[in-house]
From Swiss-Prot:
Coiled coil: none annotated. The gene is CYP6B1. Belongs to the cytochrome P450 family. Induction: By xanthotoxin, a secondary metabolite abundant in the host plants of this specialized herbivore. It catalyses: an organic molecule + reduced [NADPH--hemoprotein reductase] + O2 = an alcohol + oxidized [NADPH--hemoprotein reductase] + H2O + H(+). Its EC number is 1.14.14.1. It comes from Papilio polyxenes (Black swallowtail butterfly). Enables the insect to feed on furanocoumarin-producing plants and evolved as an adaptation for detoxification of xanthotoxin and other furanocoumarins. CDD domains: CYP6-like (cd11056). This is Cytochrome P450 6B1. Transmembrane segments: none annotated. The lineage of its organism: Eukaryota, Metazoa, Ecdysozoa, Arthropoda, Hexapoda. Its cofactor is heme. InterPro entries: Cyt_P450, Cyt_P450_CS, Cyt_P450_E_grp-I, Cyt_P450_sf, Insect_CytP450_Detox. GO terms for cellular component: endoplasmic reticulum membrane. Keywords: Endoplasmic reticulum, Heme, Iron, Membrane, Metal-binding, Microsome, Monooxygenase, Oxidoreductase.
Length: 498
């Protein structure tokens, strides 16, 4: 018995040492930060699914108001959380080449070759190739299709709201963004069966699992073990979708030159030349396997539909709570649409100045893309400090913390679109507003996201008002199992026909 007790004691001691061995890293370097917990580091609440990770980072941001750089532990791995906007500007923009990678690599067969997670060279080539899909000219050509999707969406709202005006607004607007992404990006017209399949798939994509924590504990392990952040069912679905869509198109271009047209062009080339930083640099071409192609379809779908749906959910919630803002917005929508014979055009959207402010303020208060992550490609001393981050270490920027900091946004809990008047914007630090990140690696589809959201909002508010629901009257309790921050149980509003 004594031997067993001694063995257990020794084993416990070894485990404690192993899971705390790095915890003096920042203390030795005189970098302030929260006290880590064995095994969990500073992420205990998110690992135990008590809070979303984004809210854990916000809490750390709030805890150290006088620090420029905060030393944190993502599990047992030393990382930093940046608070100083000038330093953030250096990392994201001025010294971008030192932080070009996100540091989240996983199996290329498990969707890891997508443009969001791709490393520097692969990312550059993919970004350059897909940028033409999101030019102003391309988006203008998509507006009539977005408007048609919006009209069908209103018809579906008419049906459900007649018998049940109280609706989960997130579930509702998801149907619009799913259908719109499918139509504008993939050239697909979704039927009810496909919508149900995508709704089921949502749970697999946006329910958090422990792959990310494993990669924090052992950086690079997912890539080494050919593992993925997403379940096999997700990659299998997008592999099949890619195959079926390309087979349907059979090399015939669409009238609007959508993403599938670009993918068909890439397929014919077989490889994609990687960008060279220097003229004489020897780089290998990226082989365009079916896995690489389906990874792009996955990320454009994932990023395009859920971020917009979540943003609109919060926007309609705030309008229901603030009827004066809703009245002003409805008046603008009615006036602008009347000048354009009810048609939503590029010129029409350009005149929707108050809608733009409401949208921007929603993303200020609820930055659904959560936090920005970058990996150091070299040892780097943060400007204005003597703090060095080592090559391979991770940087976190708490967008939620910055954009709800009273230092930059007085009374941050107040929903105030006037924060985005031109005179207020010009006096604000450029890195005080980062819903789409900043610099060369900002969100490629941010204009698409804004336009599709504005089309949906205009369609809804031209026919309906939103009013508060008793189901969503209390303080939010964010769902710790959801990848993007969304209240547990969703958000409900009452849809009232105008």
């Amino acid at each position: 018995m004594l031997y067993l007790l001694a063995l257990v004691t020794v084993l416990a001691g070894l485990l404690h040492y192993y899971f705390t061995r790095t915890f003096n890293y920042w203390k030795k370097r005189n970098v302030a930060g929260p006290k880590p917990v064995p095994f969990f580091g500073n992420l205990k609440d998110s690992v135990l699914r008590r809070k979303p990770q984004v809210m854990v980072y916000k809490s750390i941001y709030d805890e150290f108001p006088n620090e420029k750089v905060v030393g944190i532990y993502r599990m047992t791995t030393p990382s930093v959380l940046l608070r100083d906007l000038d330093i953030i500007k250096h990392v994201l923009i001025k010294d971008f080449e030192s932080f070009a990678d996100r540091g989240v690599e996983f199996s290329l067969d498990g969707l890891g070759a997508n443009i969001f997670h791709a490393d520097g060279d692969r990312w550059r080539s993919l970004r350059n190739r897909f940028t033409p899909l999101f030019t102003s000219g391309k988006l203008k050509s998509m507006l009539p299709l977005m408007s048609q999707v919006g009209d069908r969406f209103i018809n579906s709202i008419d049906e459900v709201s007649q018998t049940q005006p109280e609706q989960s607004i997130h579930n509702l607007v998801q149907k619009f963004t799913m259908t719109n992404i499918a139509a504008c990006v993939f050239g697909l017209n979704l039927d009810e069966g496909m919508l149900k399949t995508l709704e089921d798939l949502d749970k697999h994509i946006f329910t958090v699992n422990y792959s990310a924590e494993l990669d924090m504990m052992y950086p690079g392990i997912l890539k080494k073990l050919n593992g993925s952040l997403f379940p096999k069912v997700v990659s299998k679905f997008f592999d099949n979708l890619t195959k079926n869509v390309l087979e349907m198109r059979k090399g015939t271009p669409s009238y609007q030159k959508d993403m599938i047209d670009l993918i068909q062009e890439l397929r014919e080339k077989k490889t994609l030349e990687l960008s060279r930083k220097h003229e004489n640099e020897d780089v290998k071409a990226l082989e365009l396997t079916d896995g690489v192609i389906s990874a792009q379809m996955f990320i454009f779908y994932m990023a395009g539909y859920e971020t917009s749906a979540t943003t609109m959910t919060y926007l309609f919630y705030e309008l229901a709570k603030n009827p004066d803002i809703q009245d002003k917005l409805i008046a603008e929508i009615d006036e602008v649409l009347s000048r354009h014979d009810g048609n939503i055009t590029y010129e029409c959207l350009s005149e929707m100045t108050y809608l733009s402010k409401v949208f921007d303020e929603t993303l200020r208060k609820y930055p659904v893309a959560d936090f920005t992550q970058r990996n150091a490609k070299t040892d780097y001393v943060f400007p204005g400090t003597d703090i060095t981050i080592k090559k391979g270490q991770t940087i976190i920027v708490s967008t939620w913390g910055i954009q709800n900091d009273p230092k930059y946004y007085p009374n941050p809990e107040k929903f105030d679109p006037e924060r985005f008047n031109p005179e207020n914007v010009k006096d604000r630090h450029p890195c005080a507003y980062l819903p789409f990140s900043a610099g060369p690696r900002n969100c490629l589809g941010m204009r698409f996201a804004k336009w599709q959201s504005e089309v949906c909002i205009m369609k809804v508010l031209s026919k309906y008002r939103v009013e508060p629901s008793m189901k969503s009257s209390g303080p939010f309790k964010f769902d710790p199992m959801r990848l993007f921050a969304l209240p547990k149980g969703g958000i409900y509003v009452n849809l009232v026909r105008r």
